[in-house]
């Protein structure tokens, strides 16, 4: 009787383990998060790039409003920056430091959150970096020359005799 009860209990446990085994793979195939999908897009960008160094996620814009269907393409917008890691090393970009004065690219496109659908449509454009000219050392501004109003001839009051005598003294 004890052995029948033990085998029945063992049968139930094996049934539970079987059901759990069926549920776990479906849980692992859950939808990716927005960030994970963008990181996957950055990996694809690094794979397809012909540049010398890897790029790493610098900034991730806000995710769009929640959509229930993970198979629907979601709009993404993010910024990547060049790292010090050479592309052939195949090192994860997250472990690489950003390159000083490295290239920065703004990327936009769509990704799907379903890991079984590899739908990525991303395009990246390099952001023109604004290189600042070094400031010259502080020098005081030269002062403008003082303002002197123009000199006007003295005003002659009316009725004042003319300054020069007439050419012909007898004629007026």
UniProtKB/Swiss-Prot annotation:
Biased composition (Pro residues): 136-172
GO molecular function terms listed in the Swiss-Prot or TrEMBL record: lipopolysaccharide binding
One Pfam family of this chain: Cathelicidins
Expressed in which tissues: Small intestine and bone marrow.
GO BP field: antimicrobial humoral immune response mediated by antimicrobial peptide; defense response to Gram-negative bacterium; defense response to Gram-positive bacterium; innate immune response
Keywords: Amidation, Antibiotic, Antimicrobial, Disulfide bond, Pyrrolidone carboxylic acid, Secreted, Signal
Taxonomic superkingdom: Eukaryota
Protein name in the entry: Antibacterial protein PR-39
Residues that make up the propeptide removed upon maturation: 30-130
Endpoints of the signal sequence: 1-29
Cellular component terms (Gene Ontology): extracellular space
PTM annotation (Proline amide): residues: 169
Similarity comment text for this entry: Belongs to the cathelicidin family.
